[in-house]
Structure formats: structure tokens, C-alpha cells
Amino acid sequence: MGKSEYSEDALIQAPTAEFLHQELGWDSVLAQDEGPLVAEGLLGRTADTQVVLTRDVLAALRRLNPGLPEAAYTQALEAVVQNDSTKTLVQMNQEKYRLLRDGVLVKFRDAPGTGTGQMVEKRLRLIDFDQPGRNRFLAVRELWVRGPLHLRRPDLIGYVNGLPLVFIELKRFEVHVDSAYKQNYRDYLDTIPHLFHWNALVVISNGHDAQYGSITATKEHFYRWKRLDEDDPEPGPAQPLLPLLLQGMLDQRRLLDIVENFVLFDATEDGVQKIVARNHQYLGVNRVMARLTSETQR
């Protein structure tokens, strides 16, 4: 590892992972320690092309949808890892988003002695959006991912129940945040596109400035998250924005809320655009919903 890489890891990557772990309750691993790619390994990957952590997905399927035949879980996992090369990245992302929100439809026969023995259709949940504690949030640093032609190592991937929902590219303080977008993120979209099939948020930061967007967003449509509450003051010019973004978007309950309720696929003349709500929209809508809930409970 060169000096610049060491500095980037020591000054930005490691503290970001530590913040997710200590402040927001995420598990955190350094993929340099992954070791042999075997099912019993650190992440359960058996090939460096794999971006979905199937061991965690299966564990979540069993945990959130208990009492079903094993064939139901296996069928759901097959749908999760399925990759259709005839579809665009945006089409795949929209398809996976439906599975994320609505669950995976499976068909299976009732187990003998527990049902009628008939074929049953059921949607299996991949995530418990109501109880964050029933999900596994895992930050993985420096995971090697192999694409059709290239091998890449993203800085940090945020997994929920084995699904790579968050991509974070980090630069040193003195490097402009645009570099993370132009030199790294755009390259990863081209060289390891399957990493983004499940992506919900793209985050770029140099430790001070921090911005987020969707997989279809141009750099002009990456935004900052400056407030945790509508009444919070505007952060000063010397205040680092990365901790605010992490708290505002990657707090476990907030992340699930954003993924479930604040993502939109919009068909435009230029194609389908994926839109993630901006800071003020998220806070404003939730304030209205809280007020309505309070009024109905009186």
C-alpha cells in the first residue's frame, strides 16, 4: 500500500467505518482480512465476482420469514442474485428495488404435516423496515470486486442483510470531492456495474464536504445533507459535512425510511431517472406525518 493510500485509509476510510460502527451501530469489517473465498470465510463469498453476501441474505430470509420449507428460501435467493445481461443497469436497479420494497414472490409446496400439501404463493421479506434491529447492517471496507474485464476495490460498501445498498467513495481532505465522482465512482459504474444493481445511495466525500445521489444522477444532482432536524441551523463553513450526512442518512432507521419511502423512479424523455429525496423534503414530509399521527391519536 502506497503512502497516499495509507493516508486515505487512516484519515478517512477507517474513521468513517468507525463512525458507522460506534455511533450508528453498524458491524464493520476490513475485506483485506477476507482470506480464502469459501462459504465459511469472513463474508461467505466463493468468488470475487459476487457482490451480494448470500450467507447474510439467507439468514435474513429465514429470520424474517420463519417456518417455511428450505426450498422457499433457496428460490428467493435465486431471484436475489439473478442477473439479466439484456437489461440496463437502471432496469436491473428498478427490478431489484421492487424486490427490496415488496418482497420476493416464491411458490412452494406446504411441508407434509404442516399444511395441505398444496402449492403456496408467498412474498418473502428481505428487510424488516419497521424494526431496524432485526436487520444486519454491515460496512465493508476495500472489497475486491471483479467485473467482466477489470478488478476494482471500492472504499466502503454498506450492506443491509447482505444487499449492497450504499456505495461510499472517499478522498483525502485536500482532494476535491468531484474527484471521487469523476475518477472513481464513474469508473466503477462502467467496470463493475453489477455492484450497483441493489444500490440505494451513492455517497462521495473528502471528509469535509459530503454529497449523495442516485445511480442515474449527474454530478450536478448530487446534494448535501446539512440538517438532522428542520430547526437545526445551517452548518458553518468549517463544519465537516460527512458526519451530518452519515447521521442523517445512514442511521439505521433513517436509511430504511429513505429506501422505503423516499426513492422514486421517474420516466422522462431522457430515460428513467432514479430520484432520492433531498434533505428538506425528507424532514418536511416526516414532520407532516408526525403531526398527522399525533392528531389522530388525540
Regions found by a protein language model. Name each.
Residues G2-R298:
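ATP-dependent helicase/translocase motor core
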